[in-house]
């Protein structure tokens, strides 16, 4: 599924009911589906891009296990404030006391920001956002881990897009290579970044 920005994957404790999962299950039931779709991982509300859903709980458990064993390759596109000193590297800083590692490579440098390919090898909550903040280059649009007033570039949301997922299917053993284009709002930002 290519998740749009602005939707949660699952409900929060605030009981927000309209989530990507609820919308998908309503749609599938209206088409006569006899199963529920279950998310195999999560993306932040503001993050757009690929998310895997499974048909039923047993399929979900198999995919979740692949994530746990780090057998799924994930790649994101991020826009980071300013320009990174190292154009390629690995950030290995703990997140909430747990080991976390994020590989990155600058794909293109714009006037006030870098476009970065990001490959987390662990899946801590907000890992990418925290790691780039710690480098002194928070994501463009960041409000939770940086003060927007401290940075020249503004965006309506965090500029982070889940672009690639690669893994071996747990049942068929076939190679699965998923990708999706950059979200339209991020494409628009690239064409006309705010002053």
Predicted features and spans:
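Short histidine-centered loop motifs in beta-beta connectors
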Residues: 105, 111-119
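RNA pseudouridine synthases
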Residues: 1-101, 184-193
